[in-house]
Regions:
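Membrane-interface transmembrane helices that cradle and orient dolichyl/undecaprenyl
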Residues: 230-247
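Transmembrane helical bundles and short interhelical boundary loops of multi-pass, membrane-embedded
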Residues: 24, 28-34, 293-497
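Transmembrane signal-anchor helices characteristic of membrane glycosylation enzymes that use polyprenol
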Residues: 25-34, 45-53, 68-96, 156-162, ...
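Alpha-helical transmembrane segments of polytopic membrane proteins
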Residues: 16-18, 37-50, 72, 149-154, ...
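Perimembrane helix-loop-helix junctions
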Residues: 243-246, 268-294
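Active-site lumenal/periplasmic loops and adjacent helix-entry segments of GT-C-fold
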Residues: 85-233
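Membrane-embedded, hydrophobic transmembrane alpha-helices
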Residues: 1-69
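Membrane-interface alpha helices of multi-pass inner-membrane proteins
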Residues: 25-32, 247-274
Length: 497
């Protein structure tokens, strides 16, 4: 609550809001995609699990300094501008990857749930982030979808900022600068690996060529907000469970509900969750009950995802990528070791650097080299947890060494280059709607003048095909047993080119 010295924030209340944020899409999914008996049973499990998790959360309060009272808007404004820049709310021409989302929203708003296309394919995708806004657009009006999606995303970003403040209350600004603007980390990684930062031939703009930045991990985290939010919340809950014993039930419930947001994120977090459960679990009936509920949610979502997993398109993998896959596997035991040492709070800077440098090296190599959607999602929770520890170490080390403080500030400034460039790029594309954007992949070659500002009102261009990552044949337990039955339908006019 506000006071002359600042204000306090309750981790218990923040964890509850996070759990409700992750859980709301499940209520919509159960009510609209599943047969009534299964919807009722799973809905009761969801409500019971959330109630037990909330009830067992420790009462922990974090005191914020008084400067938070008047600098909060300064802190959140760049993040909100970045969200608008990538396409959230459709204020600007969206980032090219974000156009995939518009096909997904278009189908969710216009077609009956669960979605089956005329060729027999089903829409199989982690739809947790998309469901609240799509449901609002379906029930009310398509334009409402855009408005709800914007504020739904802004609320998620606000929770992220509050969690960062609760984790680093005295140094929130620098923490967010390192954590959220991690483009500086990737710039260093590309320099170490000898990879290019710019491609001068990819994007012709108004008068000549404006370079496009090859920052793959930034793109993936920025333009896939559902995946990023689920990974951040899950990593944060695990971090506070290990440090503060916040609530293991909250962690388990958050893990079970993250499947609908991104099943790859949930699967990648499983080794870390097992490690935290093994070291912090107590014999309570509520823990067993919440654990069973989270496993049920995970099994149902994996039944939903299984047809897509079986039919993922494959591509040849180089030896370099195989080596990076192995590095990502090594990232997990390194992270477990870091988690195991968190409680020691060793502040001798060179000892902390010995532990941080190998982890940061793995982070750089895996983040830069693994330009693969699924692998990035699998490593998202370890990525955020490693970043938590790196931020904590840097903020404690820089107090004792001036040169380390200078290096930290340079890293933050480098990180700001990346989102600033992307925001400039999207504003530029919005100012010149006649421009064409080309890419070797035909999925991204389209005339921007043919796309309306509010994409959901009209169809996307016919050459913007649906991603194969959204489609799967209607087979397996989910479509045959759990999902609602829909009558066969003809192709809708809105789906025609």
């Amino acid at each position: 609550m506000p006071s002359s010295r600042g204000f306090d924030i309750s981790l218990r209340r923040l964890a509850r809001r996070t759990l409700l944020y992750l859980g709301l899409p499940h209520a919509i999914f159960f009510a609209t995609w599943l047969k009534l008996p299964f919807a009722v049973v799973l809905g009761l499990c969801l409500v019971g699990g959330i109630y037990l998790a909330m009830k067992t959360t420790q009462r922990i309060s974090i005191s914020f300094p008084s400067k938070w009272n008047y600098r909060f808007l300064i802190l959140v404004s760049p993040l909100f501008a970045l969200a608008i820049g990538i396409g959230m709310g459709q204020w600007l021409t969206p980032h090219m990857h974000y156009l995939w989302h518009n096909h997904l929203w278009q189908d969710l708003v216009r077609l009956p749930w669960p979605i089956r296309y005329e060729d027999g394919q089903m829409l199989v995708h982690p739809v947790g982030y998309f469901l609240p806004s799509a449901w609002a657009g379906k029930v009310l009006h398509p334009i409402i979808q855009v408005i709800v999606e914007f504020w739904w995303g802004i609320y998620g970003i606000s929770l992220v900022i509050l969690w960062m403040g609760a984790t680093f209350p005295q140094k929130t600004y620098r923490a967010i600068g390192i954590f959220m603007l991690f483009g500086g980390v990737e710039i260093i990684g590309r320099w170490l690996l000898g990879q290019p930062l710019w491609d001068l031939s990819w994007e012709p703009l108004a008068e000549g060529q404006v370079p496009s930045m090859f920052l793959s991990v930034y793109d993936r985290f920025a333009v896939w907000p559902g995946q990023s939010l689920a990974a951040f919340f899950l990593a944060t809950l695990l971090y506070h469970q290990w440090k503060d014993r916040l609530s293991l039930e909250i962690c388990l419930m958050g893990w079970g509900m993250s499947f609908l947001w991104s099943w790859w994120v949930a699967l990648g977090a499983l080794p870390l969750l097992i490690f935290v459960v093994w070291h912090t679990a107590t014999h309570k009936w509520s823990l067993w009950a919440v654990g069973i509920v989270s496993c049920i949610l995970g099994i149902v979502m994996m039944a939903f995802a299984w047809p897509q997993i079986q039919n993922l398109p494959t591509a040849p993998i180089s030896y370099f990528q195989v080596a990076l896959w192995l590095m990502l596997l090594l990232l997990l035991p390194v992270q477990l070791l870091i988690l195991h040492k968190i409680q020691l709070k060793e502040n001798i800077w060179w000892i902390r650097m010995i532990g941080i440098v190998p982890a940061a090296g793995l982070l750089l190599t895996s983040a830069v080299g693994l330009n693969i959607e699924i692998v990035i999602a699998l490593g998202a929770v370890p990525f955020f947890l490693l970043t938590y520890e790196i931020v904590d170490a840097l903020l404690s080390i820089q107090q004792s060494k001036m040169w380390l403080q200078v290096c930290l500030n340079v890293l933050v400034l480098m990180g700001m280059v990346v989102p600033a460039y992307h925001l400039y790029r999207q504003i530029h594309l919005t100012r010149y709607p006649h421009l064409q954007v080309y890419d070797p992949n035909p999925l991204f070659s389209l005339d921007l003048s043919q796309i309306p500002v509010i994409y959901i009102i009209k169809d996307l261009p016919p050459d913007m095909d649906r991603s194969p990552y959204y489609l799967a044949p209607p087979q397996g337990i989910f479509s045959e047993l759990l999902a609602k039955d829909l009558p066969a339908r003809k192709k809708m006019d809105s789906e025609k080119p």
